[in-house]
Amino acid sequence: MPKLKTRKAAAKRFKATGTGKFLRRRAFRNHLLDHKTPKQKRHLATKAVVDRTDEERVTLMMPYA
């Protein structure tokens, strides 16, 4: 059986943890930041865990993660 290919777009966006979960960036932190409070921006700078409903899709895109 041939090797499975990793989806490079997913590899750039997600990072696997040691426990098998995936981390992702938060949305709403690219532009239009003037009206957001520093607390909001600090919170948006942190990583979030991919929801379990999306976990299977990410796993299929990154078979060796």
UniProtKB/Swiss-Prot annotation:
A single cellular component GO annotation = cytosolic large ribosomal subunit
Q: Which domain of life is it from?
A: Bacteria
- Per its UniProt record, what InterPro entries does this chain match? Ribosomal_bL35, Ribosomal_bL35-like, Ribosomal_bL35_CS, Ribosomal_bL35_sf
Q: Name one GO molecular function term.
A: structural constituent of ribosome
Mind listing the UniProt keywords for this protein, alphabetically?
Answer: Ribonucleoprotein, Ribosomal protein
Kindly give the Gene3D superfamilies that the UniProt entry links to this protein: 4.10.410.60
- GO biological process: what's one of them? translation
Entries under NCBIfam families matching the protein: rpmI_bact
Similarity section: Belongs to the bacterial ribosomal protein bL35 family.
Q: Which HAMAP family match?
A: Ribosomal_bL35
Name recorded for this polypeptide: Large ribosomal subunit protein bL35
Source organism of this protein record: Synechococcus sp. (strain CC9605)
